[in-house]
Each structure stands twice: as structure tokens, then as C-alpha cells.
A protein has these predicted regions:
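Catalytic alpha/beta core domains of metabolic enzymes, predominantly
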Residues: 128-129, 140-248
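C-terminal alpha-helical cap/extension of soluble enzyme domains
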Residues: 5-16, 38-40, 200-203, 207-295
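Short helix-capping segments at alpha-helix termini
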Residues: 69-75, 99-100, 130-132, 158-160, ...
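Short Asp/Glu-rich motifs
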Residues: 54-55, 89, 115-116, 146, ...
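A general structural signal for well-ordered alpha-helical segments in protein cores
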Residues: 28, 60, 64, 89, ...
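Alpha-helix N-capping/helix-start residues
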Residues: 19, 25, 57, 149, ...
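Short, amphipathic alpha-helical "lid/cap" segments that border enzyme active or binding sites
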Residues: 25, 29-32, 149, 282-289
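Active-site beta->alpha loop and helix N-cap motifs at the rims of alpha/beta catalytic domains
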Residues: 2-11, 15-144
Length: 295
């Protein structure tokens, strides 16, 4: 039987950039340490929130290596290695594996809009050439393709596929996946505003954007769910819904980097084509953070 790569709260960590658009490793190190001090169970590096889509291959590899070294086995490190080019996904995976990462996160190939058969071939090709546990990542709003429960079932027969970060918001898909794949194909929420309902349906935790700002809250929320105290967890989820809405007023990671800058965490700027928040949305975010005592 598989064991989950992690249970609880994994931060989908942002990548700080300096004024010239270069990776700010000093600020990144402080953010990593802040998350570990906040109690996170794992760190996911070079994902959507980490702006991996606008990194060069060399930068991507260097950021994963730095994260692994900075973490130094204090928590698990999950390396984003997804690509719509299967060979590139293998290349990034092998470098992450060599760096000492604990697992890989692989988003569905985007833009290509492959079939379910293509998804299976893509993931099996990667698994055949790597050794680390693989977490699938389903986010059809970004990629244009979604797994079906039947495809999850097919892939789950290979123990290297540890489970899936589910960000589709499709609770029917979640329930069908749980029914078809059994208890040892693990699911994690990819949406901060759906942590409690997903964990009530059997998810093992969250890969969280909000944790960059409120790690202790996300740790507490997931721990309450794992302890089957869904009443207390629900109250916490509801309490922070306004903030979570504000953190997604614009596409991730625009608001979370703005929020980190507001609290002095030096997330820095974004790389084009992403740009700074509108003044109206920034004021809404600032007001929400102030109401929660973060400013």
C-alpha cells in the first residue's frame, strides 16, 4: 500500500524576484524558513504560484536545488516538473530527482489539449524514466484538459503515482475518483477555499497558495480535518473566506505576491505577462488583510 507524500498543509511557494527581475534568493530563503517555522508539512517549489512558466530551464533547476538545500530535510520538498513537452518534463524530473527532492508535481500538458489516452501515455512515459513519487495536477481552468476518474483509476495501478492535486473544483469527480481508486491513491485540494469539503470527502490536505501568507492557519485547518473535527475546521474555513477570495481577485500569483509585499516579505515583482494588481483590487486585498489582523 502506498503512503502519502505528505498529509496536512503543503505551501505552493512563491518565487521572489528583485527589482531587475532576477530571482531573489535571500528573500526566497527567508520565505522558506518562515513557512517551516509556521509548521507546514511540505513545500511545493516551481509550481504555478512559483511562476515556473516564466523561468528558464536553468533557473527552474537552480530554484529547485536551492529549495532542497535550504529546507535541508526539515520538511518534504515537492518539485514542480510539469511541461506540455513530455521530454522536457522528464528532463526537469531527473534534475529534481538528482537534487534530492522528495516527490514530483506534474500538471496536465497545457495548450496541446491531448486526449485521455495522450494523458496516460505522457504520465507513463515520465514514470518509466524516473523514480520519485509523482503527484498528478489537475487544473483544467489553466490547461484546457481534465482527468476523468477512469484515467485516474488506470494510472493509480502504478504505485509511483501517489495521487493528485485536484484543482478542478469538481466534487463529483473527486467522489468518483475515491470510489474507483481506493484509499491509497491520495487526493489533495488545490483550492484554498475548498479545503474542508474536500477533506471531508477524503482528501489528505492541501497544496496551498494562502499558506504563503497564513501558514499557521492552513496547518491548523488541515490538522482539524485530519483529526475529524470538521465543525471547528469549517468555522476556520468560513472565517478566512473573505481573505481567500481577495487572494484570487486576479490570477495567481499576482495577489499573493502583493500580499507578501504588504507584510514585508519581499516577494518582489512579477514577470510578464503577469503584472501588478489593479489599484482597486489591491485596496480590496489590503482591507481584507487588515480585517484579519495581518496589517
Amino acid at each position: 500500500m502506498r503512503t502519502p507524500v505528505f498529509t496536512g498543509n503543503c505551501v505552493a511557494i512563491a518565487t521572489p524576484f528583485d527589482a531587475n527581475g532576477n530571482i531573489n534568493y535571500d528573500a526566497f530563503g527567508r520565505l522558506i524558513d518562515n513557512q517551516i517555522e509556521g509548521g507546514v508539512d511540505a513545500i511545493c517549489v516551481c509550481g504555478t504560484t512559483g511562476e515556473s512558466a516564466t523561468m528558464t530551464i536553468r533557473e527552474h533547476i537552480a530554484v529547485v536545488e536551492y529549495c532542497v538545500k535550504r529546507v535541508n530535510h526539515r520538511v518534504k520538498v515537492i518539485a514542480g516538473a510539469g511541461s506540455n513537452d513530455t521530454s522536457a518534463a522528464v528532463y526537469l524530473s531527473l534534475h529534481a530527482q538528482d537534487s534530492g527532492a522528495d516527490a514530483l508535481l506534474h500538471v496536465t500538458p497545457y495548450y496541446n489539449k491531448c486526449s485521455q489516452a495522450g494523458l496516460v501515455k505522457h504520465y507513463e512515459y515520465i514514470a518509466d524514466r524516473t523514480e520519485l513519487p509523482i503527484i498528478l495536477y489537475n487544473v483544467p481552468s489553466r490547461t484546457g484538459v481534465s482527468f476523468t476518474a477512469e484515467t485516474y483509476r488506470h494510472l493509480s495501478q502504478n504505485p509511483q503515482f501517489n495521487g493528485v492535486k485536484e484543482a478542478s473544483g469538481n466534487f463529483s469527480l473527486l467522489a468518483h475518483t475515491r470510489f474507483l481508486c481506493g484509499d491509497d491513491f491520495y487526493i489533495w485540494s488545490g483550492n484554498d477555499d475548498q479545503v474542508v469539503p474536500m477533506m471531508a470527502l477524503g482528501a489528505k490536505g492541501v497544496i496551498s497558495v494562502a499558506s504563503n501568507l497564513i501558514p499557521e492557519v492552513m496547518v491548523k485547518m488541515t490538522k482539524l480535518c485530519l483529526d475529524n473535527d470538521f465543525e471547528a475546521a469549517s468555522k476556520l474555513q468560513i472565517k478566512y473566506m473573505d481573505l481567500m477570495d481577495a487572494l484570487f481577485l486576479e490570477v495567481n500569483p499576482i495577489p499573493i505576491k502583493a500580499a507578501l509585499n504588504l507584510v514585508g516579505m519581499e516577494a518582489g515583482q512579477l514577470r510578464l505577462p503577469l503584472c501588478e494588481m489593479s489599484e482597486k483590487n489591491l485596496e480590496t486585498l489590503r482591507s481584507s488583510m487588515a480585517r484579519m489582523g495581518l496589517l
